[in-house]
Amino acid sequence: MGILRQLFGPSRDEIWSQLAAELGARHEPNFWGGGKVQIDYGEWTITLDTYTVSTGKTTHHYTRFRAPYVNADGFRFDIHRKHIFTGLSKWLGMQDLEVGHKEFDEAFVVQGNDETKVRALFANEGIRKLIAAQPAIAFSVRGDQGWFSRIYPDGVDELYFQVGGIIKDVERLKELFALFGLVLDQLCELGSAYVTSPQVKL
């Protein structure tokens, strides 16, 4: 174990245990490589975990954050960093809303079903700074992802973040928990989320 630690640094479980202790969160390690960190924020629970996608010859690991909440008006958004093919995608008709902050607009593709609320959400400087601090990001409000039946009750959506790889940077993980808290609060201020428990356990 000492040699492995020298080669690869602290394990994910060690890092996540430290994170939970510093945030007053719950860390539930899993012997088989899963595990999660959960923190209660008001009526919501923000969950950090990982998942794996196997494509035959290769296996891809992802870090994700989720926070189910009662969506008051069906508002959705999606944000990710621009890349080399963004220009082509926009030419082919991909939506890219401008939020009114030049540096942010130049760095990110922002999509949503209510442009006024998208601009109001990202008018929050704290939200923009936390998003800009992420080297990679796929952050959105998305609906129920059950293939054959609903996982969440009617009216419940989730705030969702994912990125390739396993994040073991404590400060970055703290920033992501903070981002979720700020966005949930802002969604409430915009009338797009209810301050009630979604009655969902992850």
Located regions from the model:
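Charged, low-complexity intrinsically disordered regions
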Residues: 3-5, 16-202
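Membrane engagement elements in two modes
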Residues: 10-11
